[in-house]
Swiss-Prot record:
Uppermost EC category: transferase
Species for this entry: Bradyrhizobium diazoefficiens (strain JCM 10833 / BCRC 13528 / IAM 13628 / NBRC 14792 / USDA 110)
The protein, known as: Acetylornithine aminotransferase 1
Entry superkingdom: Bacteria
Organismal lineage: Bacteria, Pseudomonadati, Pseudomonadota, Alphaproteobacteria, Hyphomicrobiales
Cellular-component GO terms for this entry: cytoplasm
Disulfide bond positions: none
Gene name linked to the record: argD1
Subcellular location: Cytoplasm
Cofactor binding mode and count: Binds 1 pyridoxal phosphate per subunit.
Length: 405
């Protein structure tokens, strides 16, 4: 039995419910604990370690950059940063990129950019942004307000003004929420923390049409879905819908902290010197890591592999549901952003899987996320499903014993 505790880290602010597990190194899809036990990592640092642990390309890039330059500030030119920005623009709708350090920071910048867009066009009254129930956009004050979840907002004073939350997937509710102060719409193509809930292509297309009709900006939060997680570089590319603004982070650096805001020239109108900034954003180490990630992901066949592993994992998980319907009931998600709807409390399933040395992460709607590195092999998929089978069997056995007692 694994206990959630903070006793091993008495001087760390106790805001995380940490398990008593500690890891000393990682190899590909595996984490090696301090006692030598090997765990199959299907958390990927919550969709961060897209290339697994200690990927040779990332190690090489960071080792080489570490001997050259770590930090110089954004007062000077950054050739490698410009290279990364150009590559991201070439692969997307964007004309401009701003680099920062995290997903929440990227979303803060998106919110500022959406508001400033209308200010620059003579409409400072347009500052409100429509968001969706079940969303998660970060833990800063602005992104908490955009998220709108009471459990995250409690204790931090009045929520920041400027966000109108509507039911997910309800286009009529979106239409009713649009007013003279509305500046844009912010949505995750797939809600990760919210329970791996996908926005349908039809819904995203309807949002795009509304934004075009009303002069709003459409912003996609691709912090979790971006950088290959759904089987393409960006999740929205598989829907046929193009945003005006997008946030990236998590897998962009493959484990090294970096975030980004991508925007069209029109969306970024008015964003000149002094309108935004970051001390560490786009530092050379982070840029080197992100360029190395793109080097790997843009090789022919990379996303085909993700899609192939996705299909295999979904098929195997469906067969587990057939045999253990008392524990799990549904598979959802795209690419290797997979959610399993649990019948038992999701925390119990996460714990049972951890006891089988398979690491997963919970989400809303009683869902357990399977987020393997995108380099996962067929053998590792098979291995993970075997561990899930054993975890489900253990839970079923425990339920039977409780019922008999």
């Amino acid at each position: 039995m694994i206990v959630m505790t903070n006793s091993a880290a008495p001087h760390l602010l106790p805001v995380f419910a940490r398990s008593d597990l500690g890891f000393e190194r990682g190899e590909g899809c595996w984490l090696i604990a301090t006692n030598g036990d090997r765990y199959l990592d299907f958390t990927s640092g919550v969709a961060v370690n897209a290339l697994g642990h200690a990927h040779p390309a990332l190690v090489k890039a960071l080792q080489e950059q570490a001997t050259k330059l770590w930090h110089m500030s954004n007062l000077f030119q950054s050739p490698d940063g410009e290279k990364l920005a150009t590559r991201l623009c070439n692969e997307s709708f964007a004309d401009f990129v701003f680099f920062c350090n995290s997903g929440a920071e990227a979303l803060e910048g998106v919110i500022k950019l959406v508001r400033h867009h209308h200010f620059s066009k003579g409409h400072p009254e347009r500052y409100r942004i429509i968001t969706f129930e079940g969303a998660f956009h970060g833990r800063t004050l602005a992104t908490l307000a955009a998220t709108g979840s009471a459990k995250y907002l409690e204790g931090f004073g009045p929520p920041m003004d400027g966000f109108d939350q509507v039911p997910h997937g309800d286009i009529e509710a979106v239409k009713k929420a649009i007013g003279p102060q509305t500046a844009g719409i912010l949505i995750e193509p797939i809600q990760g923390e919210g329970g791996v809930r996908s926005a349908t292509p039809a819904f995203l297309k309807a949002l795009r049409q509304l934004c075009d009709e009303k002069g709003l900006l459409l912003a996609f939060d691709e912090v979790q879905t971006g950088m290959g997680r759904t089987g393409d570089l960006f999740a929205h590319r598989r829907t046929g819908v193009t945003p005006d603004v997008m946030s990236l982070a998590k897998a962009l650096g493959g484990g090294f902290p970096i975030g980004a805001i991508l925007a069209t020239a029109d969306a970024a109108a008015g964003m000149g010197p002094g309108s935004h900034g970051s001390t560490f954003g786009g530092n050379p180490l982070a840029i080197a890591a992100a360029n190395a990630v793109l080097d790997v992901m843009l090789k022919p066949g990379f996303f085909d592999h993700v899609q192939k592993m996705s299909l295999l994992l979904k098929q195997k998980l469906a067969s587990v549901i057939d045999r253990h319907g008392d524990v799990v009931s549904e598979v959802r998600g795209e690419g290797l952003l997979i959610g399993i709807k649990a019948v038992v409390p999701s925390g119990d399933l996460v714990a049972a899987l951890r006891n089988e040395k398979l690491l997963t992460v919970g989400a809303g709607d009683n869902v357990v996320r399977f987020l393997p590195p995108l380099i996962v092999t067929e053998a590792e998929i098979e291995d993970s499903v075997g561990r899930l089978e054993r975890a489900c069997a253990a839970i079923s056995s425990s339920q039977t014993k409780r019922a008999a007692s």
